[in-house]
Amino acid sequence: AEAETKAKEHHFVRFITAQNEWSLLKREGECDAIPACEQYGLGQLPYFPLASGLLTGKYHRGEAFAAGSRLATLKFFQGWATDENFTKIEALQAFAKKRGHTLLDLAFSWLAAQPCVVSVIAGATTPEQVHANATAANWKLSAAELTEVDALAPRASV
């Protein structure tokens, strides 16, 4: 916010986008960074939209992580595999399945439905993953569906 104010005051080139970690499991940015983007007209480019694979549907509570995956090898990412997150994942997966979609579809479509999101930064290791990521946001969530998703994976509180 301060950089935006200074840029306006001094007629500097303004920021046009911001990158923040943002997903259905990581919503802390909605308390500060996202409202600032909306206030200053900045586009948001969320990264880790699939929470390091947890929102793909391939990981399940109580199962070992795939050998070589981030969740198996890096302690930072293992911290995401909590009972609280798996409870959200299971509810979100059921929500998506009931509507004929995947958890991955929901993760991308939910981000695409956010007003300030201009694109999503997503990684892929196979051509199939690229295709799945590219087509996932085709699901246009209704206002009622967005409200239901918010109840299943609530915003972080300040």
Region annotations inferred by a language model:
Residues 1-151, 156:
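Beta/alpha (TIM)-barrel catalytic core signal, keyed to glycine-rich beta->alpha loops juxtaposed to Asp/Glu
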